Amino acid sequence: ITEAGFGSDLGAGKFLDIKCPTAGIAPSCIVLVATVRALKYNGGVPKDKVAEPNLAALEKGIVNLAAHLANMQKYGVPVVVAINRFPQDTQEELDYIAAYCKGRGADFALSEVFAKGAEGGVELAQKVVEAVAKPSAFRSIVAGCGSIRERLETIAKTIYGAREVIYTPAAEKALRDILALDPAMDGKPVCVAKTQYSLSDDPAKLGRPTDFAITVRDIRLSNGAGFVVALTGDIMTMPGLPKVPAAQGIDVDEKGDIWGLF
């Protein structure tokens, strides 16, 4: 079981297109996790209003879930949509999502582990057990791509829904420098660093953006890890930290004892 964080266009994509082919493994099922409030946010509701019932916004924002679902189904593996239920979610909203998913060939389950503990995860677990028993034919979407550019374009157009990929002069130079080291580098997998808030490289473009370009501002070689990193937007490759990282509460006294560890 692998938890591939961020949106499915990022975490799941890297697991399915980099790790699985490299390790020679294939998933038996994909669990796509969403929340009612996030879908309403994608439907235009301000963050401080997402807990309020709003079926109209849900109907507008569900195109985001539809895009992620369609993307995961391209890998040839059964998909289960799991909704992390919040107390404010209405039955009408949950029923709408369930019907929407089933109409698109995906199983649906509620996850209520936070409120009910292990009991709240039984429904989802049962759906996953049923899904892994179904036939599947996993295939990476970049299988057969012969170059870094081709892999980037396939990911951008097939998963993000982009119109094209634009390279800045810095990215063009970086790619030339990488290939100058060894032309075989063109066979490296591509790890895209992109915002998790949008299918595009612009976090303000919610829902299901269309007719947009993905701009690659730089390309870096992570040769030890075995891939190249394509940087888009202003995303950082460092792990996300809170405004006050836990490290600020850690200290070492004059005796060499460490304080503030969890």
Residue ranges: model-predicted function:
Residues 1-81, 85-93, 99-262:
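P-loop NTP-binding site
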